[in-house]
From Swiss-Prot:
It is found in: Cytoplasm; Cytoplasmic vesicle; Microsome; Endoplasmic reticulum. It comes from Rattus norvegicus (Rat). The modification Phosphoserine is found at residues 34, 50, 53, 70. ATP binds at residues 279-287, 469-474, 547, 562, 698. Catalyzes the conversion of fatty acids such as long-chain and very long-chain fatty acids to their active form acyl-CoAs for both synthesis of cellular lipids, and degradation via beta-oxidation. Can activate diverse saturated, monosaturated and polyunsaturated fatty acids. Keywords: ATP-binding, Cell membrane, Cytoplasm, Cytoplasmic vesicle, Endoplasmic reticulum, Fatty acid metabolism, Ligase, Lipid metabolism, Membrane, Microsome, Nucleotide-binding, Phosphoprotein. One of its GO terms (cellular component) is cytoplasm. Present in testis, at a lower level in brain, and at a very low level in ovary. Not detected in other tissues. tested. Present in Leydig cells of the adult testis and to a lesser degree in the seminiferous tubules in spermatogonia and Sertoli cells (at protein level). Belongs to the ATP-dependent AMP-binding enzyme family. Bubblegum subfamily. This is Long-chain-fatty-acid--CoA ligase ACSBG1.
Length: 721
């Protein structure tokens, strides 16, 4: 029996002549749609399918039946580099949960969450929502469209666009059709797109705008596997061969029988690849991280449980999707975990990181939220700017409330019975701040993908917002360690996800060693890169992360830096840069970015950038200092309000204050080889467009070393002479 019936889909408007078997069903006001969807442009026709409706054509199976995937992988290796390869799942003896596929996960979710709102999106300034039934049916339609376009097993559909329902439909549809989901960052150059699309053998590329379409048109001749491009947010500028809109894709898919799609779904196995995540490629070409269906479904279930994500039966989680879905952290959190637990995922505008994110947060009021450290830092800086512009009494009230709350959270972090002053501070001040940020209902705030400064963590603790860390890699399907309201320790990355394992190798006297991981989260291998796969996975199957850290007596992990980032001075001293960089930023609130230098050099030096405002249109750093930076200048006796005033004129007061701050950091250093002896302030803050930051705002150290080579070399010229 086919698992689907026809469900209307329309990106821009509904065709009134389109036949729809549900036209006789009067369910427009049921949960999951807005009552006026039929009058507004919509992704679907506006009616929610109920479980009892004969039109949905779904024969829901019991969980036991859905999980009964035949799997005989006893002879498989733990790794493969072939897109069509299989691996032996890491079931025994620590993680015996039955494996299942993405389709089985979604199909089970329909039984529990079918009528709940799944995806929220804005059309003509109004929020619209679709249910999990509609989500599933549209994904099937997209899957059939991909099959009609010629998607082959173990080939990819590459997606190049901002977060949207269509991104989700394309991803889920790809897996249903037996393909491999491959995200490409929207900031990627045509050359980077060409490398990834060629490496993953993309049969179809899905883009959102004409700008992204133009990139693909430039490189199409160099992509032998590419058969078609689908564009969804705006139509192509003209009719082009093998370029389709999303509506045309779905129309083509109607020619594929439901039974043909079901046959493909039924042959899928949990130990086959379904997602490719490409690393940033800071030391060469990007590596394609192959993730199996079991990697995805196991992590979506158990990784999120470790973060206290709730199933919709208890409380439907509401999340805002805005971080790049090409990154595993956003993809596993927004897309796959959402399906597992029946969350409602609402999409922010494409310019969310340029300043509109807070508007979406206020409108949606998420129950859990994830941001990379740079996002949390920008929120902190914005609050500080607003506070600086407030009246004397309001500013003092905020400082008092944050001081009282920070002290309470530091001294009695797990005490639910807070003293009267803390409750008063929260009621009078902090609750209003959280509401203004859109966090009034947010119970869990996560961060990952990069280290977070102690200053930022303490700032949000002062607002009664705990930031819960997760630690993992693309190669561990995202979270291998998680913090939660019940598993929290300040500055730590949480504890290992139950069912996973960790060990530290080559530990020093302080217990710091390389972090090695084992479990169902561990990737299949790097696509077409056997040597790199052997470097990452040892003979016993442990993933060597390249990250350094230590474990406390309770199993909480503390990251100390990257093995590859470890600075080895000319004198043979091993210096982890991150703690020193964080100490400088903590000591000097005017500093935005700090990067330590000294590998194979006789002493340490540092590049600094100043906190500046961002252009609201482009999100580029401007020359204007933030309010916090201006306050710092005033405190030290400077009238500067721009970066150029400080750097161009070598502002004596600011330079002296920075010198004194660095001397204080040096005074607290373990030994003289850890002292910063020279430093320079750059004329512009680090940014994605400048190349110093990656798509998730992670510092690209090799790029910085190359870009500012002349400045760095000048630090050491006297030494050479």
């Amino acid at each position: 029996m086919p698992r689907s019936s026809e469900a209307g889909y329309c990106c821009l408007s509904r065709d009134s002549n389109m036949p729809d078997s549900r036209d006789d069903q009067q369910q427009g006001a049921s949960m999951g749609t807005s009552p006026d969807n039929s009058q507004t442009s919509s992704l679907i026709d506006g009616r929610t399918l109920s479980k009892e409706s004969p039109s949905h054509g779904l024969e829901l199976s019991a969980p036991e039946k859905a999980r009964a995937a035949s799997l005989d992988a006893s002879e498989e290796a733990l790794w493969t580099t072939r897109a069509d390869g299989r691996v032996r799942l890491r079931l025994e003896p620590f993680c015996t949960q039955l494996p299942y596929t993405v389709h089985q996960m979604f199909y089970e979710a329909l039984d529990k969450y079918g009528n709940l709102s799944a995806l929220g999106f804005k059309r003509k300034d109004k929020w619209e929502r679709i249910s999990y039934y509609q989500y599933y049916l549209i994904a099937r339609k997209v899957a059939k469209g991909f099959l009609k376009l010629g998607l082959e097993r173990a080939h990819s559909v590459a997606i190049l666009g901002f977060n949207s329902p269509e991104w989700f439909f394309s991803a889920v549809g790809t897996v249903f059709a037996g393909g491999i989901v491959t995200g490409i960052y929207t900031t990627s150059s045509p050359e980077a797109c060409q490398y990834i699309a060629h490496d993953c053998r993309a049969n179809v590329i899905v883009v959102d705008t004409q700008k992204q379409l133009e990139k693909i048109l430039k490189i199409w001749k160099d992509l032998p596997h590419l058969k078609a491009v689908v564009i969804y947010q705006e139509p192509p500028p003209k009719k082009m061969a093998n370029v389709y809109t999303m509506e045309e894709l779905i129309e083509l898919g109607q020619e594929v029988p439901e039974e043909a799609l079901d046959a493909i779904i039924d042959t899928q196995q949990p130990n086959q690849c379904c997602v490719l995540v490409y690393t940033s490629g800071t030391t060469g070409n990007p590596k394609g991280v192959m993730l199996s269906q079991d990697n995805i479904t196991w992590t979506a279930r158990y990784g999120s449980q470790a973060g206290d994500i709730q199933p919709a039966e208890v409380q439907q989680e509401v999340v805002v999707s805005y971080l790049p879905l090409s990154h595993i952290a956003a993809q596993i959190y927004d897309l796959w975990t959402g399906i597992q637990w029946g969350a409602q995922v609402c999409f922010a505008d494409p310019d969310a990181l340029k300043g509109t994110l807070v508007n979406t947060l206020r409108e949606v009021e998420p129950t859990s939220h994830m941001g990379v450290p740079r996002v949390w830092e920008k929120i902190m800086e914005r609050i500080q700017e607003v506070a600086a512009q407030s009246g004397f009494i309001r500013r003092k009230m905020l400082l008092w409330a944050m001081s009282v709350t920070l002290e309470q959270n530091l001294t009695c972090p797990s005490n639910d019975l807070k003293p009267f002053t803390s409750r008063l501070a929260d009621y009078l001040v902090l609750a209003r701040v959280r509401q203004a940020l859109g966090f009034a209902k947010c119970q869990k705030n996560f961060y990952g993908a990069a280290p977070m400064t102690a200053e930022t963590q303490r700032f949000f603790l002062g607002l009664n917002i705990r930031l819960y860390a997760g630690y993992g890699l693309s190669e561990s399907t995202g979270p291998h360690f998680m913090s939660s309201p019940y598993n929290y320790r300040l500055y730590s990355s949480g504890r290992v996800v139950p069912g996973c394992r960790v060990k530290l190798v080559n530990q020093d006297a302080d217990g710091i060693g390389e972090i090695c991981l084992w479990g169902r989260t561990i990737f299949m291998g790097y696509l077409n890169m056997e040597d790199k796969t052997h470097e990452a996975i040892d003979s016993e199957g442990w993933l060597h992360t390249g990250d350094m850290g230590r474990l406390d007596d309770d199993g909480f992990l503390y990251i100390t830096g990257r093995l590859k980032e470890l600075i080895i001075t000319a004198g043979g001293e091993n210096v982890p840069p991150v703690p020193i960089e964080e100490a400088v930023k903590m000591e000097l609130p005017i500093i935005s970015s700090a990067m330590l230098i000294g590998d194979q050099r006789k002493f340490l030096s540092m590049l600094l950038t100043l906190k500046c405002t961002l252009n609201p249109e482009t999100s580029e750093p401007t020359d204007n200092l933030t309010e916090q930076a201006v306050e710092f200048c005033q405190r030290v006796g400077s009238k500067a309000s721009t970066v150029s005033e400080i750097v161009g004129q070598k502002d004596e007061a600011v330079y002296q204050a920075i010198h004194e701050g660095i001397q204080r950091v040096n005074a607290n250093a373990a030994a003289r080889p850890y002292h910063i002896q020279k430093w320079a302030i750059l004329e512009r803050d680090f940014s994605i467009s400048g190349g110093e930051l990656g798509p998730t705002m992670k510092l690209k150290r090799l790029t910085v070393l190359e870009k500012y080579k002349d400045i760095i070399d000048s630090f050491y010229q006297e030494q050479k002479q």
